[in-house]
Amino acid sequence: MKILSIATTTSDLSVALNEADHLVREKIEENQRNHSVDLDPDIASLLAENGLSLKDIDRFAVAIGPGSYTGLRVGLTTAKMFASILNKELVGVSTLQALAQNFAGEDALIVAALDARNKNFFAGAYRGKEAVIADGHYHLSELLEQVGALPDQRVIFVGSDFSKYQEEIAAGLADKDLRLAEGEENLLHAGAIGRLAVSAPVLDPDQAVPNYLRRTQAEYDWAKKTGQEFEADSAYVEEV
């Protein structure tokens, strides 16, 4: 099964080609803010380098959130379009679960977190592929409390630059063997999305929506305008 994976939920842009759970080729552009401009050329280049076309792909996989609102929509819209037009499978993978795969070989609790400002994080904790703290929007103090309550001795934080919170994290998890990922260890890899996509449930392209984990201002405005309470699995993107 050939899987084309797309990661546009962070400032880095990544696309990958997997043969089942085997990585064939991956491209990553760090600190790339023009995802809407660069995504299609990167996909075309990746396919051309491997003598393939979009028609050869069996499954399209995309980081479905959380992350950058604009980036989420760019990646998901592209994957949905390919899957719909070519009548191929579409799957969505948690950004945080994919980040946790950077340390898949470690015997540790992996806390994947993206800075959401003001000491808030989009975060989840994983043992291998198993989520032990559900992906959510947490204040740092709440996240540390939940991690501290778990029995795992080794804990690795990945996904963001945690240096400015290092002292607070260390104090909150004083009884843990703590490591904070640095530099390229925090990159989101489309190849990891491809591996996770092998066992991910297939989505209906017409119903697939981003997993923001919190409302955007546009969603607040939409709820006010329509009088309908926004739900995380609602078809808000389709409604507006």
Regions found by a protein language model. Name each.
Residues 30-38, 69, 73, 77, ...:
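Residues at secondary-structure transition points
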